[in-house]
Amino acid sequence: VVYKARDRVTNETIALKKIRLEQEDEGVPSTAIREISLLKEMQHRNIVRLQDVVHSEKRLYLVFEYLDLDLKKHMDSSPEFVKDPRQVKMFLYQMLCGIAYCHSHRVLHRDLKPQNLLIDRRTNCVKLADFGLARAFGIPVRTFTHEV
């Protein structure tokens, strides 16, 4: 669950992604560990910025920059958007820049969809978000068969 919040120190609007730690024996979910470890290494204008990680009793909060619009909401509320090839190309270019940056850092997002592409309304900047299913890739440890 993601909440809109205000940083008490900077007065900046932020997004808080709450992760429940209900099972004491299981610890932090692997999706949260992956998202944190990958995002703290990546800094790019087309990737959502992870600002902090806060641990409190039975909860983990990921603190992100706040962006209130995703591509799905944008397309639903602005049907003329898909008819404007210049704007579509601009958004697609930014998305590809973010993906290229991920790949250059050996990260596969694995959950690209309009809801995971956030838009900064002030700058029209598109940012990849939700790296919970993302994976780092490298040389495979074991060889896989070519047969299914």
From Swiss-Prot:
What InterPro entries does this protein map onto?
Answer: CDK, Kinase-like_dom_sf, Prot_kinase_dom, Ser/Thr_kinase_AS
Its UniProt entry gives the catalysed reaction(s) as: L-seryl-[protein] + ATP = O-phospho-L-seryl-[protein] + ADP + H(+); L-threonyl-[protein] + ATP = O-phospho-L-threonyl-[protein] + ADP + H(+); [DNA-directed RNA polymerase] + ATP = phospho-[DNA-directed RNA polymerase] + ADP + H(+)
Q: Where does ATP bind?
A: V1, V2, K17
> Which residues participate directly in catalysis?
D111 (proton acceptor)
| Range of residues in the leader sequence | none
* EC number(s) per entry: 2.7.11.22, 2.7.11.23
Q: What class of enzyme is it?
A: transferase
What domain of life?
Answer: Eukaryota
Annotated protein name in UniProt: Cell division control protein 2 homolog 1
Q: Name one GO biological process term.
A: signal transduction
- Residues bearing the modification Phosphothreonine: T145
- Entry keyword set: ATP-binding, Cell cycle, Cell division, Kinase, Mitosis, Nucleotide-binding, Phosphoprotein, Serine/threonine-protein kinase, Transferase
State the activity regulation: Phosphorylation inactivates the enzyme; while. Thr-145 phosphorylation is required for the catalytic activity of the enzyme.
Annotated PROSITE patterns: PROTEIN_KINASE_DOM, PROTEIN_KINASE_ST
Family label: Belongs to the protein kinase superfamily. CMGC Ser/Thr protein kinase family. CDC2/CDKX subfamily.
Lineage start: Eukaryota, Viridiplantae, Streptophyta, Embryophyta, Tracheophyta
What role does this protein play?
Plays a key role in the control of the eukaryotic cell cycle. It is required in higher cells for entry into S-phase and mitosis. Component of the kinase complex that phosphorylates the repetitive C-terminus of RNA polymerase II.
Q: Name one GO cellular component term.
A: cytoplasm
Task: State one molecular function term (GO).
Answer: cyclin-dependent protein serine/threonine kinase activity
> Where does the record place the Protein kinase domain?
1-148
